[in-house]
Amino acid sequence: MRPRPGGATVVLVHGASVTADLWRVHTRHLTGLGLTVVRYDQRAHGHTPCGQAPLTIRQLADDLHQILTSIVPAGPLVLAGHSLGALVLQELAALHPQHQARVRGMVLLSATACGASVLPGRSPRALLLAAGRSLFALTCTHAPRAVDLLRHRLPTTHPYSLAPRPDRPADGPPPCRHGIRHTHTRDLADLWQCLRRYQPRDATVLNQFGDRLLLMAGADDRHIPAAHTKQLAAQLPAVRLEIFPRTTHALPIRHPELISARIARLAAEPGPHPPHPQDRSFPNSLPSGQFH
C-alpha cells in the first residue's frame, strides 16, 4: 500500500466482535474517489491473534499508532472508527498527540464519554436486554471452553457459530456478527472485561480537532445510546454532531454510502466545513447538519 502523494489516507477502525470487513463497501466507495484506504483487523479479531499483551483499549491504540508509524508515516490522515474503534481513536488522540497535526478529519461513530454498560436504558425492554447481556458475559467469562464447544456444534449458518459461513456473499454489507464467528469466547470475554473496566480519558483532548471532528450516532442504538454521544458532544464546543432517526448501532453497515460521503468530505482539502445537505436516506428527517 503506497499513499498517493499529497492525498489523504483514510484509516478505518472497526468495533468489537466484527472485522475489517465492516468497511468493505466503504473501501470500494472511497478508493473509487481516488483515496488510499487502510483497514485492518484489530487485535483478537479476524485474522489478527490476541498476542501476549493484555487486551486493553490502550494496547489497541498503541497497535494503531504502530500501524500509522509503519504504513502511513507521512501525509494527511482521515481517521474513522465505530464503537470500540471510536474509543481507540479517542485513546490514540490522548496517548499519541504527535499524529494530531496530520489529521485532516476524524469521524467517531457511536462514540461515548462513558464506560461500557450492559444497560441501554430504563425501560422494561432495556432491563430485559441488560439481564440477557449480563448472563451472556458471565457465562463467557467463567466457562469460555464450554461455550466454544457449544459454538462448534451449532449449525454453520448460526450467527454465533465458531465456523466460517460457507455461503457468505461477495458483495454488500457483511452481517454484524461475522466477526464473532471468527473470535474465540475467551477473547470475547477479555474484550468485554476490557470495555467494562475502561475509564474514558478527559474528552476535551478531542478539542484539538475543532470542527474537523464529526460525531455520528443512530437514534435507536441500543448498544451505545445516542444520549451518550450527545454527552460527549456537549464537552466539545466546536464538534459537529449528527443523530440519525430510525437508525441503530449498525449505522455504518446499513448506510455505507452516507458514511463514505462524510469521510470523503473531510478528506478534501482543509477548509471550513459547512453543514451537510439533507441525505436522501432520511427524507423525513431534519437536514443532517444537526450539529451541536
Specify the residue positions occupied by each region the protein language model found:
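Short beta-strand/loop motif that positions the catalytic acidic residue
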Residues: F209, L215-A217, D221
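The conserved beta1-alpha1 loop
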Residues: V13-G15, H82, A217-G218
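Active-site loop/oxyanion-hole signature of alpha/beta-hydrolase fold enzymes
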Residues: T36, Q42-L87, E91-A101, A113, ...
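Catalytic active-site module of serine/aspartate enzymes centered on a nucleophile-bearing elbow/loop
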Residues: P237-H292
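Conserved alpha/beta-hydrolase catalytic His-Asp/Glu region
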Residues: A143-N207
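Conserved alpha/beta-hydrolase "acid-adjacent" motif
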Residues: R222-H228
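Conserved HGGG/HGGXW glycine-rich cap/lid loop of the alpha/beta-hydrolase fold
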Residues: R2-P49
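Flexible "cap/lid" loop of the alpha/beta hydrolase fold
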Residues: Q98-A146
